[in-house]
């Protein structure tokens, strides 16, 4: 049985992982510094936490379910206690991309992150429909990267990833650099920003007299059908009027050089701001 040391087990993300790992084939040792986190694990999942040294004794995998800003400090504090060949799993590309993982060639570094349940899905159960984050009831895709270590280690990392993010559909293999392009680049800098703009546009319509429920229903409904056409979920085309609105709308809303947010230096700067 593979031994996993789960750091940050009582935190927001760590708790999700602890819940999904419970009952799996993995022997999990839980590490949590906060009393509230320890109590939550004990009261909700009947899981006890252990000291760091006990958790690391014989551990083949260490999962760092801690904030991006803490990964470097936590990893530096345990790196000398890890035996050669130990796999260190990070749940986001930011800290690994920024170079916050210790330089030690005999360790394996594996990075994995959920895509979250897609807007277009086949969920019929209401609990799954309401599981927008994923990892509980709704199926989701995932991305993973073997940052360093033997190629043979990828299979174990992916197996763990499929457990902690379950239920999983497609599992995509990417590089750490590609994962950083996806987040923060695609998902946060672009998608989240444009969604905020859409919400602000809705609020502007409300401020100009449109009933709020009408504006919200109209926007979300159109996001559904427009998104289905744009992302090829349906075989459809936009009307001439819609295409003309897009032709004039993009230049009015977007800078000509907006794709520069995907340049390596911009991705690095974005990650530097959050780590």
Curated annotation (Swiss-Prot):
Reactions it catalyzes: D-apionate + NAD(+) = 3-oxoisoapionate + NADH + H(+)
Binding site for NAD(+): 11-13, 32, 68
Keyword DNA-binding: no
Pfam families referenced in this protein's UniProt entry, alphabetically: NAD_binding_2 (PF03446), PGDH_C (PF16896)
Binding positions (Zn(2+)): 113, 183
Cofactor: Zn(2+)
Claim: Nucleotide-binding is one of the keywords in the record: yes
Pathway where it operates: Carbohydrate metabolism
InterPro entries cross-referenced by the UniProt entry: 6PGDH_NADP-bd, NAD(P)-bd_dom_sf, PGDH_C, Semialdehyde_DH-like_C
UniProt GO molecular function: metal ion binding; NADP binding; oxidoreductase activity
Annotated keywords: Carbohydrate metabolism, Metal-binding, NAD, Nucleotide-binding, Oxidoreductase, Zinc
Enzyme class at the top of the EC tree: oxidoreductase
Enzyme Commission identifier(s): 1.1.1.421
Biological function: Involved in catabolism of D-apiose. Catalyzes the conversion of D-apionate to 3-oxo-isoapionate.
UniProt similarity note: Belongs to the ApnO family.
Protein name: D-apionate oxidoisomerase
Lineage: Bacteria, Pseudomonadati, Pseudomonadota, Alphaproteobacteria, Hyphomicrobiales
């Amino acid at each position: 049985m593979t031994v996993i040391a789960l750091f940050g087990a009582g935190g927001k993300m760590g708790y999700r992982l602890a819940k999904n790992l419970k009952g799996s084939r993995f022997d999990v040792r839980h590490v949590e510094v906060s009393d509230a986190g320890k109590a939550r694990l004990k009261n909700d999942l009947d899981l006890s936490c252990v000291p760091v040294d006990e958790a690391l004794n014989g551990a083949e995998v260490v999962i760092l379910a801690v904030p991006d800003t803490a990964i470097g400090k936590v990893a530096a504090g345990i790196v000398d206690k890890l035996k050669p060949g130990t796999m260190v799993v990070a749940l986001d590309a930011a800290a690994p991309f920024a170079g916050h993982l210790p330089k030690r060639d005999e360790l394996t570094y594996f990075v994995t992150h959920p895509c979250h349940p897609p807007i277009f899905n086949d969920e019929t159960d209401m609990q799954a429909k309401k599981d927008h984050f994923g990892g509980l009831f709704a199926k989701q895709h995932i991305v993973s990267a073997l940052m360093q270590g033997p190629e043979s280690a990828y299979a174990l990392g992916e197996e763990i990833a499929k457990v902690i993010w379950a239920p999983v559909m497609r599992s995509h293999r990417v590089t750490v650099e590609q994962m950083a392009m996806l987040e923060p680049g695609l998902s946060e800098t672009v998608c989240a920003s444009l969604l905020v703009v859409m919400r602000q546009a809705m609020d502007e319509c409300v401020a100009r007299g449109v009933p709020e429920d009408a504006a919200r229903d109209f926007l979300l409904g159109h996001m559904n059908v427009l998104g289905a056409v744009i992302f090829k979920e349906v075989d459809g085309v936009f009307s001439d009027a819609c295409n003309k609105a897009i032709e004039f709308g993009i230049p009015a809303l977007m800078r000509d050089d907006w794709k520069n947010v995907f340049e390596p230096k911009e991705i690095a700067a974005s990650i530097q701001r959050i780590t």
